[in-house]
């Protein structure tokens, strides 16, 4: 029995943006114009024996600059947000036709129609938050019966993917169909959290108001932040 292994160090490249309502465009310009008109009127009608202090004038002029600065800041943030959206769309579109590992437990097995064809299976994997000295994969059929137990051994923290050779416990070849995999991991006898991963093929990208989603065909859709590994 052979298992192909792929390991990826855990990284976090997620980017989140927050938008809020603000004064932009003509509203900000109108407010600035009104503010200047009121300030000029105040200066014209002030008591000449008690004129406005320099620090008061400076403070009010600073408020005008603040309004203008907020408008420019909103424009800049809008531009940055648009660039981030475009970058994420490009990143997502580059995944079309590629396999990805996402949270899940499904493993598919299939054998070609020709005589002597080798059974092929979709990869499965695990995500560990810390190193484990004992990792076991248990494969069950659609009825929940255990058909194979694989001793993976030690694994470092991170994302790891494997390929089952399609052999059952008795040495026979697994029938075509869908199987489930459960991962057990421990370190020094202490059970660890082990997130099982399944393989899916990215068939398209769906753009929406809430961001981009990946079309995984029969596996439905998922978001970029759910992708643990690209194969």
UniProtKB/Swiss-Prot annotation:
Pfam families from the UniProt entry: FlgD (PF03963), FlgD_ig (PF13860), FLgD_tudor (PF13861)
Domain of life assignment: Bacteria
The answer to keyword Coiled coil applying to this record is: no
Query: What keywords sit in the KW lines?
Result: Bacterial flagellum biogenesis
Q: Where is this region: Disordered?
A: 1-26
Which residue stretches does the UniProt record annotate as biased composition, category Polar residues? Answer: 1-10
Coiled-coil stretches? none
Q: Does the keyword Phosphoprotein apply?
A: no
Task: Output one GO BP term.
Answer: bacterial-type flagellum organization
* InterPro entries documented for this protein: FlgD, FlgD/Vpr_Ig-like, FLgD_Tudor
Described by its record, this protein's role is as follows: Required for flagellar hook formation. May act as a scaffolding protein.
The entry assigns this protein to a family as follows: Belongs to the FlgD family.
Name this protein carries in UniProt: Basal-body rod modification protein FlgD
- Source organism per entry reads Escherichia coli (strain K12)
Q: What is the lineage of its organism?
A: Bacteria, Pseudomonadati, Pseudomonadota, Gammaproteobacteria, Enterobacterales
């Amino acid at each position: 029995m052979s298992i192909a292994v792929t390991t990826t160090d855990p990284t976090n490249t997620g980017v989140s943006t927050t938008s809020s309502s603000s004064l932009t465009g003509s509203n900000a310009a109108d407010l600035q114009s009104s503010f200047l008109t009121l300030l000029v009127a105040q200066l014209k009608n002030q008591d000449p024996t008690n004129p406005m202090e320099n620090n008061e004038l400076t403070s009010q002029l600073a408020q005008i600059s603040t309004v203008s600065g907020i408008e420019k800041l909103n424009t800049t943030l809008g531009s940055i947000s648009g660039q981030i959206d475009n970058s994420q769309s490009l990143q997502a579109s580059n995944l079309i036709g590629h396999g990805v590992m996402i949270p899940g437990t499904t493993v598919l097995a299939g054998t070609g129609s020709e005589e002597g064809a080798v059974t092929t299976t979709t990869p499965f994997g695990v995500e560990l938050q810390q190193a484990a000295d004992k990792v076991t994969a248990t494969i069950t059929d659609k009825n929940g019966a255990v058909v194979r137990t694989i001793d993976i051994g030690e694994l470092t923290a991170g994302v790891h993917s494997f390929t089952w050779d399609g052999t059952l416990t008795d040495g026979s070849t697994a029938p075509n169909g869908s199987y489930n995999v459960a991962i057990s991991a421990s370190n020094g006898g202490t059970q660890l959290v082990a997130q099982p991963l399944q393989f899916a093929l990215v068939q398209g990208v769906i753009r929406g108001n809430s961001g981009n989603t990946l079309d995984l065909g029969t596996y439905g859709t998922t978001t970029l932040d759910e992708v643990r590994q690209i194969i």
